[in-house]
Design a protein with these regions (language model features):
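Conserved, mostly hydrophobic/aromatic
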Residues: 10, 64, 111, 225
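A short alpha/beta connector and helix-capping loop motif
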Residues: 15-47
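Glycine-rich tight-turn/loop motif centered on a GG-T
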Residues: 19, 33-40, 73-90, 121-125, ...
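Acidic (Asp/Glu)-rich catalytic clusters
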Residues: 24-28, 49-62, 102-105
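Glycine/small-residue-rich loop that forms an oxyanion/phosphate-binding "nest" at active or ligand-binding sites
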Residues: 70-110
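Flexible, glycine/charged-enriched surface loops at secondary-structure junctions
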Residues: 105-109, 207-217, 249-254
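C-terminal domain-boundary segment and adjacent tail
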Residues: 142, 236-254
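Active-site rim beta-loop-alpha module in soluble metabolic enzymes
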Residues: 149-207
């Protein structure tokens, strides 16, 4: 049986030369690039440059929109209707994705929300619905990359959108199958061997070991390594090599 999986990384976010070099290098090992659209990072110049690098590397392009919150890198949780008006958020997300589509000359294949927007939409039905409506409004052929067995999954199904579940190589999971908050010690996995072990477990068994040591199911068609984490390029390289050795074809889902 043909086995394949996607490797994705967040890109277009760099704020230092070293980080930018890491983003460029990681293109050699991933199959999909989530490109920041200006909400938490990036501008038209970085979008054009990152999209070009992805295209030259044969990497699928995805939009990585966020709350319009550059100050907090899109990682501050906001309450819909209190901290941000739903209409304002909807317009911001639409504009972010549309700008990337212009920068990439229409070659955007999917959408992956960023940071707090992603984490909250896993559990918040109204927020997931808003994101789904924005994707439909932009282009109903766009796929949606997000948390498996989540409100995002349900929102995509209700709107007839293609949905791909994602697993994280470098993040701990809680017992409910969602990510441990970054503020907690150990939430970001920094050890390369531990990252590789989690990647292989996600790909081969569709399971991970939670923070409390419980085995939980994660149905992931794409594995993410955060481009801003230390050692990201090496993680992508060894993960790709190990997956190929295990019989997987590294292939974009869209």
């Amino acid at each position: 049986m043909d086995k394949f999986i996607d490797l994705n990384a967040d890109t277009g976010e760099a704020s230092t030369p070293d980080w930018a070099a890491s983003e460029a290098a990681i293109m050699d090992y991933i199959s999909s690039a989530n490109i920041a659209c200006g909400g938490h990072a990036g501008d038209m110049e970085t979008m054009v440059d990152t999209a070009r690098r992805a295209q030259e590397s044969g990497v699928s392009i995805g939009a990585h929109p966020s709350y319009p919150d550059r100050k907090n890198f899109g990682r501050l949780e906001l309450t819909l209707g209190e901290d941000i008006d739903p209409k304002i958020l909807s317009e911001s997300l639409y504009e972010q994705i549309a700008r990337l589509m212009d920068a990439a000359k229409g070659e955007v294949k999917y959408v992956k929300p960023h940071g707090a927007l992603y984490n909250q939409a896993v559990k918040a039905k109204p927020l997931a619905a808003l994101i789904g409506d924005v994707i439909l409004r932009v282009d109903s052929s766009l796929s949606w990359l997000g948390g498996p067995s989540s409100e995002m999954t349900q929102a995509a199904q209700e709107r007839g959108l293609s949905f791909i579940g994602e697993g994280f190589i470098d993040r701990q999971y809680s017992e409910d199958g969602h990510l441990v908050a970054r503020a907690l010690d150990g939430a970001v996995i920094r050890d390369q061997e531990a990252r590789l072990a989690q990647a292989l477990s996600l790909a081969k068994t569709k399971h991970v070991t939670s923070r409390a040591g419980q085995k939980i199911s994660i149905e992931a068609g794409s594995l993410c390594v955060h481009g801003d984490s230390a050692g990201a390029v090496e993680t992508a390289r060894v993960t790709r090599d190990a997956l190929i050795e295990a019989g997987f074809d590294i292939r974009a889902f869209a």
